[in-house]
């Protein structure tokens, strides 16, 4: 479950083959570089380099000889230098629907945690291994394990702060008195989808039907022993299809079609979502960060759009950002505005990356599916916000300025330089300031009025309906199963 979740601003990434521009030179837009699938690369059989395997692999922990599908698939990984160079380059002759899951499994080691481990230790394990979710075992070899992720950490934080309540009075008392709480008890507080297990002899068509319904990941198991061989996440499947899109000619028509034509994404925030659309959930930039975290908790979502009073998209806050407020010294951020939090994160990311960064987590109704998938893959995001382009001459709110921890802001005249550089495992430490990653914006980086959202689930559901026998796949079924918290 190494699925990298969307960050606060979904910073863009530059392709590895793109040369860095000089400070005074306009940088090429990421979508100009990534709107078409990577060129086909013929890989010789027998090569040992993990970067040329069908799905890259990474040793996550010693002592566990289980296997995983990819660097990002066993436990939802955050940004890493290794993943920036992990390209899925294996060429397949058959249609993608018929590829057996066994062909994608690569030997690796999974990271599991015991249900008796404290929430604090579980969080430290996430950070130590640069992950965003971990399987929680009640006993070694537990086949019905659930996962601990940042949604659980968010629920725990809200419980500690007294912003939510649960029926278990003992857990409430332990949380609010600072006592260690077993992670196995916390994960039970957040509704989960079933732990789906798919035999490795099944093909991608089967998995597409499951992931296209909104399930975030499935376990790939040995067909004889039923032991887990790996975990396939929505994003890793999307990356696999994108990186090999030139080999799958039946994807061409869909990739060249616009979101509007395909009918995916909510294109009107006032229109109720259908069975094939996701809801647009946003928060005003003037609201406290704590309200945003609570809203993500109640709505069972992993990210939320930040807008101004005119409905203009300003930024994005992800549930993974809760790691930025786990220390007592960071608690003041909880009561400051969402706009302030976004600016602080931009500064922090700029310092960690060593380069300027700017969010490109939006697309337009007229954007092609290819451009949308390219941005999802490049930003490691789960969803992109659909905006209506700003008409010339229309005044809109200025973009969020990177802000220091004390609230001061600074702007730079430099041009934007999207970067795929990773966020280090220690990114949950104190937030610091850096030079502003915002500067003169060209049309590609301007946003607009929030009118919709398109997610990995929407796209995988579309592929399932168009190219598999799963014609009735409902992208919202898994979310309805998880439910929302009564307010």
Curated annotation (Swiss-Prot):
Subcellular location: Cytoplasm; Nucleus
Keyword Lipid metabolism: no
Main localization (coarse): cytoplasm
GO molecular function: protein serine/threonine phosphatase inhibitor activity
GO biological process per UniProt: cellular response to glucose starvation; regulation of mitotic metaphase/anaphase transition
GO CC term, one of those recorded: nucleus
Alphabetical keyword list: CBS domain, Cytoplasm, Nucleus, Repeat
InterPro entries, A to Z: AMPK_gamma/SDS23_families (IPR050511), CBS_dom (IPR000644), CBS_dom_sf (IPR046342), Ssd23 (IPR016711)
UniProt region (Disordered), positions on chain: 1-39, 56-84, 406-439
Annotated CBS domain residues: 105-165, 189-248, 274-333, 396-469
PROSITE patterns for the chain: CBS
SUPFAM superfamilies noted in UniProt: CBS-domain pair
Pfam families: CBS (PF00571)
Biased composition (Low complexity): 70-84, 414-430
Keyword Repeat: yes
Function per UniProt: Involved in DNA replication and cell separation.
Family: Belongs to the SDS23 family.
UniProt name for this protein: Protein SDS23
Organism: Eremothecium gossypii (strain ATCC 10895 / CBS 109.51 / FGSC 9923 / NRRL Y-1056)
Annotated gene: SDS23
């Amino acid at each position: 479950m190494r699925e990298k979740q969307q960050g606060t601003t979904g910073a863009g990434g530059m392709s590895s083959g793109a040369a860095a521009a000089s400070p005074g030179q306009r940088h090429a837009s990421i979508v100009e570089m990534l709107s078409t699938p990577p060129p086909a690369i013929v890989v010789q059989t027998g090569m040992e380099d993990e970067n040329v395997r069908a799905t890259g692999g990474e040793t996550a922990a010693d002592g566990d000889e289980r296997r995983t599908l990819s660097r990002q698939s066993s436990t939802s990984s955050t940004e890493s230098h290794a993943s920036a160079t992990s390209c899925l380059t294996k060429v397949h002759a058959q249609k993608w629907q018929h590829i057996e899951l066994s062909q994608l499994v690569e030997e690796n080691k999974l990271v599991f945690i015991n249900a008796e481990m404290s929430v604090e230790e579980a969080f430290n394990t996430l950070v130590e291994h640069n992950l965003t979710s971990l399987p929680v075992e009640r006993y070694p070899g537990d086949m019905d394990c659930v996962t601990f992720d940042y949604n659980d950490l968010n629920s725990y934080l809200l419980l500690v702060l007294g912003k939510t309540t649960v029926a278990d009075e003992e857990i409430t008392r332990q949380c609010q008195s600072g006592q260690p709480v077993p992670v196995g008890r916390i994960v039970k507080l957040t509704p989960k989808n079933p732990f789906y297990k798919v035999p490795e002899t099944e093909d991608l068509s089967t998995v597409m039907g499951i992931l296209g319904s909104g399930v975030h990941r499935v376990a790939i198991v040995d067909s004889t022993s039923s032991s887990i061989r790996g975990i396939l996440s929505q994003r890793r499947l999307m990356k696999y299809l994108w990186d090999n899109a030139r080999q799958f000619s039946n994807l061409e028509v869909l990739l060249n079609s616009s979101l509007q034509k395909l009918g995916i994404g909510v294109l009107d925030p006032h229109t109720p979502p259908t069975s094939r659309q996701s809801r647009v959930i946003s928060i005003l930039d003037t609201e406290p960060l704590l309200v945003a975290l609570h809203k993500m908790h109640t709505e069972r979502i992993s990210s939320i759009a930040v807008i101004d009073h005119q409905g203009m998209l300003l930024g994005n806050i992800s549930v993974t950002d809760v790691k930025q407020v786990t220390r007592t010294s960071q608690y003041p951020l909880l009561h400051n505005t969402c706009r302030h939090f976004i600016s602080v994160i931009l500064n922090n990311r700029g310092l960690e990356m060593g380069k300027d960064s700017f969010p490109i987590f939006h697309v337009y109704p007229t954007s092609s599916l290819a451009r949308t998938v390219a941005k999802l893959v490049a930003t490691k995001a789960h969803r992109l916000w659909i905006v209506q382009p700003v008409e010339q001459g229309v005044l809109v709110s200025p973009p969020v300025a990177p802000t220091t921890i004390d609230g001061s802001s600074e702007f730079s005249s430099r041009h934007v330089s999207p970067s795929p550089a990773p966020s280090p495992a220690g990114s949950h430490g104190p937030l610091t300031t850096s030079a502003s990653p915002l500067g003169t914006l060209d049309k590609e980086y301007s946003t607009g009025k929030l009118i919709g959202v398109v997610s990995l689930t929407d796209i995988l559901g579309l592929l399932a309906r168009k190219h598999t026998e799963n014609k009735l796949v409902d992208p919202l079924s898994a979310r309805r199963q998880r439910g929302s918290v009564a307010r």
